[in-house]
Curated annotation (Swiss-Prot):
Catalysed reactions listed for this entry: GTP + H2O = GDP + phosphate + H(+)
Protein's name according to its UniProt entry: Elongation factor 4
Species annotation: Bordetella petrii (strain ATCC BAA-461 / DSM 12804 / CCUG 43448)
Name of the encoding gene: lepA
Keywords (A to Z) from UniProt: Cell inner membrane, Cell membrane, GTP-binding, Hydrolase, Membrane, Nucleotide-binding, Protein biosynthesis
EC number: 3.6.5.n1
Amino acid sequence: MQHIRNFSIIAHIDHGKSTLADRLIQRCGGLAAREMSAQVLDSMEIERERGITIKAQTAALQYQAQDGKTYNLNLIDTPGHVDFSYEVSRSLSACEGALLVVDASQGVEAQTVANCYTAIELGVEVLPVLNKMDLPQADPDAARQEVEDVIGIDASNAVLASAKTGMGIDEILETIVARVPAPQGNPDGALQALIIDSWFDNYVGVVMLVRIINGVLRPKDKILLMASGATHLCEQVGVFTPKSQPRTELSAGEVGFIIAGIKELAHAKVGDTVTLAGKPANAPLPGFKEVKPQVFAGLYPVESSEYDQLRDSLEKLKLNDAALMFEPEVSQALGFGFRCGFLGLLHMEIVQERLEREFDMDIITTAPSVVYEVEQRDGSIEIVDSPARMPEVGKIADIREPIVKVTLFMPQEYVGPVMTLCNNKRGVQINMSYHGRQVHLTYEIPLAEIVLDFFDKLKSVSRGYASMDYEFLEYRSADVVRVDLLINGDRVDALAMIVHRANARYRARDVVTRMRGLIPRQMFDVAIQAAIGAEVIARENVKALRKNVLAKCYGGDITRKKKLLEKQKAGKKRMKQVGSVEIPQEAFLAILQVEDK
């Protein structure tokens, strides 16, 4: 065990994490030259394309150090994005060390900070590496200073490297051997293994990526998953060098995979503890939590005949994405579809994109909404994830909405516009600090304001320079109301929305005006109203199409004209009582993709 080193790489998007991993694998001869492809560890096409890492991957590398000994280095690649922060914390708790990769030309960014704090809390040794030193605009001294100011770790001996040219790779490996502690653990104790990640393989079922904390695991052992209580027979264990290589056993301190013929990914939860069914460990490893979706949206097939196909596609995605939740939902407007829960906005975009790309689906997505806690008058608490499920106004005692803590980094010339944006989104400033040219802002903002378009607006007011990271803080009482849309006095469930009371009139006005342009004119007047409970707060009319009944009267008596007009009016009134208004699909899309102008 003295020769094992487990480490991961923390970095912001595009700071060169995956390229660095490629170089380390190449230097240790993990893959033959012909098998190297850029970003070896990012196995999904969408990961390569967006340049992000979604699932954790590992590589077990053999490194011959300068002291002549051979070390087993286990590289655990972590996702860097905020939506996957739970996966990050699991990956980090399986390591003793982490490389903090900072782009020497850009300095520290928001996500790096969040993940780095997670690492420090978990007691992981953090080794700073300044990457992209081959760029002419690289400024190592400023970057060093920023790491010390913002994160507060000593960066005087940070390794200068360039993953692209291969400079500094040997130094990084030597630093890992010298500074990352060897794993602690007892190979003779009861088996405890932490599930870092799990995914579904078409041939063998669920593959679990684990870090063995104590004990030894061999094939043919009967294993118990502590959170779900399921038992399975372990069929195969091994390591990835990124290719999978079977082994006869995995012992304490090692990182590898277990295949046990599990059919459902839901049984192998990330962060769960694996132990032997025969002699189980006394307690599971700490830190396991069920991943709860934060953002909900409806997904509907454009063609209602594709409903079954959409369900199959979602089920296939769920095999590899335990955090995705979905349940069937029917809407008057869009037909049959699903209410899906996601970890955050990026997760939602990725699911949509994978549905479109891998399964060739055409889908309509409704505007994302968040989960509210509604306390009713009788004391019961209801969890509401869609406007249609909000109880009636009279029954509600209190509504609580999720608040997130947002960390923002930006060059100081953009502080003004970014602060204005946060204040418009009902944000409360908690902290602000200057680090060289960078400014670090902390805000508490309701999640509902962030899911709509906060990220896009942030990028546009800061010309793309601001970076953000958010984490869930708590539920807080809020004055939010459900705004219903009525067409000729009938509620349309699909168009209801939950908004803050202060913005309600403004949003209602906006939506009603937009609807007026989208509903085609009928033979009778159509009233479009927005209401909170019974109080109408905005109204527009779509005027009726009418025939000119007076065309045949030349001159003549006024009473004759009046009679014809009265007759027309009575006819229209009768039509209005029996006629129904067809709402075109475009009208729904216009509302659901509502922008705060």
